[in-house]
């Protein structure tokens, strides 16, 4: 494609709704146990990318983000197919940031990650949330801290230059000491980026329905966790 006129850059977001299982706090649109729909969804998303491409004809795409759901659960072949469609029908900056959200339980195969890296993905965002297996179970997460370490090692082996970790504070029963340990554990993996979010109980989620029986850090404790993260990460170069 040739660009008649360059306007402001665009970011593309591709939603991949499939999950192995739905987490207790998540209110994003996602489907668990529907692997039978993956091929049809991939084909439909590719058609949609082609249909709307003319609207972006005068724009350079500088970011591409595959979110979900659990995009890594779609499998590398389908993901590569979608990224090829993006590159074919859009003006993607050669230096564009191309991110794939992944859960640690579906990001441990370094050969699959290498295929994604070779296709053009250059950033992995891992939904770690906690390094404490008890906290992870309370969230309905199906991975372990061991799998987090294995996933990051696989990303490094596959030559991903940018690995980001998502963490959540204010979890049911979480203490400041547990949060401090989660942060220190996370830094042992030397991620390029960390995102820290306060837990929010969204209406309609399992955690929201259980809210009266949960022991949650109060607002002051959550604020302390936030401030600790800001200072601790600043001291460590983030």
Where are these regions (language model features)?
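C-terminal scaffold of the Radical SAM
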Residues: 2-9, 30-55, 59-238
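Short active-site neighborhood of thiol/selenol oxidoreductases, capturing the structured segment around
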Residues: 12-15
């Amino acid at each position: 494609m040739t660009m008649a006129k360059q306007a402001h850059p665009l970011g593309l977001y591709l939603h991949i709704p499939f999950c192995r299982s739905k987490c207790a706090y998540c209110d994003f649109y996602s489907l668990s146990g529907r692997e039978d729909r993956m091929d049809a969804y991939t084909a439909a998303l590719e058609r949609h990318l082609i249909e709307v491409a003319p609207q972006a004809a005068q724009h350079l795409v500088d970011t591409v983000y595959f979110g979900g759901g659990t995009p890594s659960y779609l499998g590398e072949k389908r993901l590569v197919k979608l990224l090829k469609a993006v590159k074919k029908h859009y003006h993607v900056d050669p230096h564009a940031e191309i991110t794939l959200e992944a859960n640690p339980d579906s990001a441990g195969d370094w050969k699959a990650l290498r295929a994604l890296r070779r296709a053009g993905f250059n950033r992995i965002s891992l939904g770690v949330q906690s390094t404490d297996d008890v906290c992870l179970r309370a969230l309905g997460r199906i991975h372990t801290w061991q799998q987090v370490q294995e996933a990051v090692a696989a990303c490094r082996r596959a030559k991903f230059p940018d690995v980001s970790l998502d963490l959540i504070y204010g979890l049911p029963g979480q203490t400041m000491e547990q949060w401090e340990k989660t942060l220190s554990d996370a830094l042992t993996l030397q991620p390029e980026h960390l995102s820290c979010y306060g837990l929010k109980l969204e209406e309609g989620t399992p955690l929201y329905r259980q809210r009266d029986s949960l022991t949650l850090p109060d607002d002051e404790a959550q604020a302390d966790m936030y401030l600790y993260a800001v200072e601790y990460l600043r001291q460590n170069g983030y």
